[in-house]
Amino acid sequence: MLNRKGSAVLLSMLMASSVLAACSKSNDTSEPSPSSSGSGAPTSEPSASASASASPSESAQALKGTINISLPNASSSVWNAVAQGYMAKNPGVKVTVDNKPLEGYKEWLTAQFAAGTPDVDMVVNNEVAGLMNDRKFMDYYPYFDKQNPYTNKPWKDSFDLSAMGINLDGVGPEDYLYNLNFESVQIVWVYNKEIFQKVGIAQTPKTFDEMMNDFKKIKEAGYTPLALAGNSNSMWSGQAGWLVRIYADQYLRDYINIARSQEQDYTYLPEVDGTWKYDLNDPFNDANSKVTKNELRQLKAIKDKAGPYKIEGNPKWAAYADNLKRLFQYVPSGFFGVKDDQAYNLFLTGKAATMMSTPASYWQLPKDFADESKTGAKGGVKPFEYGFYNMPSMEGPEVMAPARTIQIPIGFYGFVNKNAEQNALNADFMMYLTSPEGYAVYVKAIQASSDASLSGAPALKDITLPPEMTKAFADFSPIGNTEGYQSPGNSLARGLMDYQPSVQDWVGSVQRFFDGKLTTEQYLKELQANVDKYFVPMLKQGKKELSDLDTPERRPPERK
């Protein structure tokens, strides 16, 4: 579910590509040790015989405690509705909702751990890799085999695990699931049909060159072609960052031949990797469910500047950077100071022709046309007809495959790791939310809200969506996913693997490049130097050493 400060705000959820995978590998085969300071907890785990009826069951009455929810930019009305639904079934539990602004959420969440175990329980945790590495969040895997009292089936049977990118056959004792992604998102282009018609564009672009020609016409007609934020947050973790990573993928798809697990590797799974074959015609060829990756092989390739992991002097990187610069000439005036809500306002008010978004805009735009706070106009603005199109493909001799997009399960709902009783209570809340009964409350609240929309079909079984939602989601064709992979686009195109000093340096470099102060050659030289400079500190932050890369087939030792 997305709260629209814009869909422009959306991927706070896709903030850090290296953190997107919910699984965190470790050598420790023990479960995360519970905190001794968890908040009020139930006296026992929910019974498998709990009733799914509207009235509280005996086991539900045994549940006692508090669940504190603080999500970024989330609809309070929606989550309060879910909380009320859960408390009606579990009268001994109090659920509080105190959602936070997107801006500063990562810092707020990190600060909660400064004095020990936080009061907050349910959070969005995809930005805080360090806290994940320190196992500050509850592991979901131990609860998958437990009975969901709201369905009377094992909880794992509630999920479409393939759609969630989870292969339980490949989960070992060193794997942890720190966040749950049971919704979906596909990044698409949204366009103002009226502007397209006014400037003589008869059909949506299929290629990048077609889109650049269309943007030229739009700009000459006095409109902003692309409503895009350009501040540092957007360049790293928001819509600008999406485009930087998505289009790099077209040129660097052969990364998988380096990053994939080899037969001798500790990450190798015969039942998965033994049948895999490289196939550029398959846009899902490198999906995590089809082939495993060895992070050490990726890191070694970055250090050795091997294949597509070499930036400077690589003609593929040069061709990609040249096209990227073309695209970023059509952004709003004062681009590097533009924030998400400002960019979204340009589209809402008919001043910009396109924006990046998700299927959630299908329902959210009509709400936002009438929203004075988002349009800046009394009574809102006159609605216009809008449509969607998929990512147009860059073309040229260096391109390896058609464009893909970010098309992944989302949510990133995690719980602070507390004592066993509190963890069990938190898991019970999620069992309710992901059940047909709980999810129906959630969807009904979204439909009734003014500030939330469903971004895609849920990866949940036995769920029935309203007919209009089912029809709308069927209109978005899958073209493949780039997100959550150990690819050069994700690990190098915005600086080194979301290591913040590197990201900050890259933002300065790319600003100079887009402003014409750096040539393509100079920009790529700076980016390569950036990666080299921060490589060892980045390794150490992830509790790895250069010596680990000498034997990528071996599991690295655990370090405190």
Give names to the regions the model predicted.
Residues 1-66, 88, 539-560:
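Short, low-complexity disordered leader/linker segments with a strong preference
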Residues 181, 468-541:
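C-terminal capping/gating helix-and-loop segments adjacent to ligand/active sites or protein-protein/ligand interfaces
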Residues 85-163, 194-200, 206, 353-354, ...:
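Extracytoplasmic "Venus flytrap"/periplasmic binding protein-like
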Residues 94, 199, 332, 351-357, ...:
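Extracytoplasmic/periplasmic substrate-recognition and gating elements
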Residues 62-74, 93-98, 178, 226:
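Short, well-ordered beta-strand elements
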